[in-house]
């Protein structure tokens, strides 16, 4: 199972970040306030590690400490290095540092990219290993409990949209200021694909479910970013707040039942076959107001009544080259990134609940291109757990729809208390100092005990 998880993590996190990294080279964002505060509270001269540093936006927050960033994604590391940061490529599951070497560590949006509980524990324990006794560790992960976003499952796929990275930020009224795509200043820290870039996802549900779709990813099919940017917000952070509301309509994942999804499909018909879109292996759906990496509770715009309709507009008549994924995103088995297959026994990552009625389409990691069908996830109406269920095969989809799956990233969204429970039960060397919800994320600050066996 660990090998299968690693392979899927490579496909749905590592490869995605490596392919999209060039779009971040000219984009920047400020450090998120609570993370900035944590870093500034560290003693002068402290040695701090940012595990999953991405482009390095937290590495220069405090000039009185020495910071070292590391990330699994080499292209992101190169961007951080070009900005004068001290960085290196490494794996969160096997950090190349000696024991008790760092005074503080931050892990912002990394742990939720690990596909199994065991791998999440290993990543946290590895950070605890290199932390000095009395040192502090800050962890941010996506929260399942959010005001304006609903998850049916804890394991979801979230799309990355190239179109938004190309959008001119000058439209917001403050030209010359830059920010990372999908990462507004407040409430949206960049969630890099560090070692924690591991991803396996529950694509399957129960065959006897009354719902025909469980959608965990938002739509990347519309031709333009259609959300109206609100002018509300504080003067200092208004730019990032309002721009973030535009992004949130694209970078989110929530669930819709079949009837709601069909209504949205009827409103928008930019593709040749909307039926094939609705039956896609990873059902893509319109979203309300959520972030790229952090769910923000604010609405998209104060005067909008129907937020679902806002994210659908008539596409422009121009070409949609951005819908097509680069050839570098071809998957391990040679298929399109959106083609999800199961292993030989018909289970996803060794799941034990598969039914005989579910047809096997070849090995998940080592399968050839001979399989011609996709697997559509069907989840039970009230299911919110991440246990794999069953799947049914559906017709092969349009190439453009398959290509749009190239940038689907895996997230394990944490329930309330799950992260704290993980530390208390499995990482005894850490003592929790504080925990809470911060803009759709669970944040935990823990301290390494003075005496650890």
Swiss-Prot record:
InterPro entries: AlkB_tRNA_MeTrf/Diox, Methyltransf_11, SAM-dependent_MTases_sf. It comes from the Eukaryota. GO terms for biological process: tRNA methylation; tRNA wobble uridine modification. Coiled coil: none annotated. Keywords: Methyltransferase, Phosphoprotein, S-adenosyl-L-methionine, Transferase, tRNA processing. Its EC number is 2.1.1.-. One of its GO terms (molecular function) is S-adenosylmethionine-dependent methyltransferase activity. Belongs to the methyltransferase superfamily. This is Probable tRNA methyltransferase 9B. It comes from Bos taurus.
